Amino acid sequence: MNNAIFPNKFKAALAAQQVQIGCWSALASPITTEVLGLAGFDWLVLDGEHAPNDVTTLIPQLMALKGSASAPVVRVPTNEPVIIKRMLDIGFYNFLIPFVETQEEAARAVASTRYPPEGIRGVSVSHRANMFGTVPDYFAQSNKNITIIVQIESQLGVDNVDAIAATEGVDGIFVGPSDLAAALGHLGNASHPDVQQTIQHIFARAKAHGKSCGILAPVEADARRYLEWGATFVAVGSDLGAFRASTQKLADTFKK
């Protein structure tokens, strides 16, 4: 057994409420993802919702992270079993599921990652995740080593946060601050007091159910505040944001 895969160290860290500092990968490039993997982050989101990623771009990025201590987390474009199955088969063990609003939707996400009888994952005997059939106990280990993080980013999701957090198999609750702000009537202003109060409420309810909570916070002051509020896995920036800021600074240094 490949000990870098099983047990799932990121899943264990969430269960232990250990602080995990991460980064967002949106450039869909194996080179930039490899650089992120060398930086020392605990986890990396490879974004399949808002970034131009699919199976063919994600496989090279997973290859680029081989040997990295950073746990790859895929954000799928939608909570759909076939999409999730394909991400499982190419080698993802950690999932961020966007726009979860009910306990039923959370349970469906969990079921999509589990083989029967615990779930509905389709069975392939040879794929990248089981090293093309060379991992003898893959089926026995897989169900126990998948991480499910559900994203709350709507008023309905906030209303159902207790039921969602209590769902068996859900490892963490993640706040989508931009969509949440829009849902609360503050498009483009995640710093609005209403949004901040709601974020703190989501964190508190997740913690009450023993679940880790996380968020994307590219502004340092925001990230530190969320950590103080009890967030345990925080993405503190993105490859796109870092690249844009550094190149703009470089240009400004010589052009202004």
UniProtKB/Swiss-Prot annotation:
Recite the UniProt cofactor note for this protein.
Binds 1 Mg(2+) ion per subunit.
Pathway the protein takes part in: Carbohydrate acid metabolism; galactarate degradation; D-glycerate from galactarate: step 2/3
Nucleus as UniProt keyword: no
Active site: residue positions: H50 (proton acceptor)
Q: What is this protein called?
A: 5-keto-4-deoxy-D-glucarate aldolase
Q: Which reaction does it catalyse?
A: 5-dehydro-4-deoxy-D-glucarate = 2-hydroxy-3-oxopropanoate + pyruvate; 2-dehydro-3-deoxy-D-glucarate = 2-hydroxy-3-oxopropanoate + pyruvate
What single Pfam family name could you report for this chain, choosing any that match? HpcH_HpaI
Gene3D superfamilies documented for this protein: Phosphoenolpyruvate-binding domains (3.20.20.60)
State which gene encodes it.
garL
Superkingdom of the organism of origin: Bacteria
- What residues bind substrate, as annotated? Q151, S178, D179
**Assigned EC number:** 4.1.2.20
**Subunit comment:** Homohexamer; trimer of dimers.
Q: Which NCBIfam families match?
A: GarL, PRK10558.1
Positions bound to Mg(2+): E153, D179
